[in-house]
Amino acid sequence: MIDADGNLVCPPIADPHVHLDAVLVAGLLTRKNQTGTLLEAIDIWGEWREHLTKDLLKTNARKVIDWYIANGVLRVRTHADCTDPTLLTVESLLELKEEVKDLIDLQVVAFPQNGIFTDPMNEKLLRKAIDMGVDAVGGAPHIEYTREDGVKDVELVYDLAEKYDRLVDIHIDETGDPHSRFVEVMAKESINRGMGERSAASHTTAMHNYDNDYAYKLIGNIAKAKMNMIANPFDNAVLQNRRDGYPRRRGITRVDEMSERGINVCIGHDSIMDPWYSMGKGSMLQAAFLLLHMGQLNGASQIQQLFDMITTNSAKTMCLSDYGIKEGNSADLIIYDAQTEEDVIRLQSECTHVIRKGRVICKTQPAKRDLLYSENKWVDFKL
């Protein structure tokens, strides 16, 4: 018996977008990301990938999974770079998925980091990754050499996902370039194939810089397609629009406008101590807190929406059927050291209990701050 003492009990947190193949390598890199840009990070990763071993990858990923569990995150979707000829990352993460299944539910996306049509081998590697058993097919159309190849990138992802009955999760328009408009192709494919609810568009940071008339039309098509949208505030806040000078545009997609149109928007952590982002500890509450500020989402109803973006919205994006506190579902839940969703985000509350399949797998004693200048007085920042 656990006494929650009036505190918030909710389903586990879900992270729909992370790269477990790259976590925790920031301190091992011989070359640092001096410009802080997405493109330099991709170059650094390409150099580092040649030195990556299965043991190191799985050791780092397991450590981050421990962090996730301590933060109440029990559903995770990871991308696996499938442009490495060895497919080491795909093989390692599929093995890890099986090894940690009693602790956490893991989905693996075949992600062509360097594009599909930038190298003759990349399409073959993507197809092989699908044969290996990944859960979703990914793409990166904005990385391709031309607009035409970018369109082909999206179309091939849908062809493969439809043929092999996989989910779709595409890194798309992850740039400040307002001319990068591949999510419109994704919306079209989702509508024509009826695959929107099984599709996720990750990043879409170029939407921030679109002409408003075009963005309004696009958001309508995304809503019609019933697509899922993933914002990644940690990386996008620091990687995008770095050449702007001042005033500097925010690198966050149009979360508020899409939410107002009823589109399912959720939040991903994306990177944890890697070439793209050297910070992070697997806390989705931190990601929600940052998006609250970067996306100007501090309205009363928006704060509740933020909590949904790391729970139910993320679960919907991941197409999870066994999610939520209801009869018949797996007994997975967490208890926070706060009574409301707003206070959980404000306080960045600890999970006092993390429960997996009816078993407590993590307990945390929240910090208590004793004020030594006054007898029997302490602070917990609660009202």
Please place each PLM-identified region on the residue numbering.
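Histidine-rich, glycine-flanked metal-binding segment
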Residues: 1-10
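Histidine/acidic residue-rich metal-binding segments in metalloenzymes
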Residues: 88-102, 119-228, 245-267, 323
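Active-site mouth loops of central-metabolism enzymes
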Residues: 43-60, 109-120, 141-148
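Alpha-helical scaffold segments that flank or form the walls of functional sites
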Residues: 26-79, 87-99, 125-131
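His/Asp/Glu-enriched, well-ordered alpha-helical/loop segment
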Residues: 167, 188-199, 235-239, 249-336
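Histidine-centered catalytic micro-motifs
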Residues: 11-23, 167-176
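Active-site gating loops and adjacent loop-to-helix segments of metal-dependent hydrolytic enzymes
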Residues: 24-57, 133-136, 182-200, 223-228, ...
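Active-site microenvironment of metallo-dependent hydrolases
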Residues: 304-383
